[in-house]
Amino acid sequence: MALREIIILPDKQLRLVSKPIEKVTTEIRKLADDMFETMYDAPGIGLAAIQIAQPLRLITMDLAKRDENGETKPEPRVFINPEVIASSEELSVYEEGCLSIPEYYEEVERPAKVRVRFTDLDGKVHEEDAEGLYATCIQHEIDHLNGVLFVDYLSKLKRDRVLKKFEKAAKRAE
């Protein structure tokens, strides 16, 4: 496993539409391992491959829960070629953040429940219903695969303010 660099807004790669994965290979498994290491190190709960400059339809996620003793139990999940195949009309609002837009959080409204189809690392296709944080996180990460960022859901004024802030920071870093 290896830590990868997370690309940051305004990197134009974040706007790429990621390519489907044709076959689960050793390279894809290694990429998923690297993504988990990078995600846990950041720390974050979800990471799309494009966030480490790999334009592939691959997501890692861990919405670890605490057990009755207060211990956190990791729940690493891999989603290959994920897609939302149904969503509720009911909406929910969660405060979202993003490893590619560090230290910026904003409330985003999304469907409260979604049905997701994806392939796992064994090549098996699954369909699952997601709600709550799981629904929000999977939609956020699938958006990344389509070149969409959570700030795209904000008002034009807020979105433009965030984009300008990160563009200025990138220029200062050059």
Curated annotation (Swiss-Prot):
Amino acids binding Fe cation: C98, H140, H144
Cofactor (UniProt): Fe(2+)
EC numbers: 3.5.1.88
The record's free-text note on cofactor binding: Binds 1 Fe(2+) ion.
Iron listed as a keyword: yes
InterPro entries in the cross-refs: Peptide_deformylase, Peptide_deformylase_sf
Record: active site: E141
Example GO BP: co-translational protein modification
Family: Belongs to the polypeptide deformylase family.
NCBIfam families referenced in this protein's UniProt entry, alphabetically: pept_deformyl, PRK00150.1-3
Primary role: Removes the formyl group from the N-terminal Met of newly synthesized proteins. Requires at least a dipeptide for an efficient rate of reaction. N-terminal L-methionine is a prerequisite for activity but the enzyme has broad specificity at other positions.
Name the record gives this protein: Peptide deformylase
Annotated organism of origin: Bradyrhizobium diazoefficiens (strain JCM 10833 / BCRC 13528 / IAM 13628 / NBRC 14792 / USDA 110)
Gene that specifies this protein: def
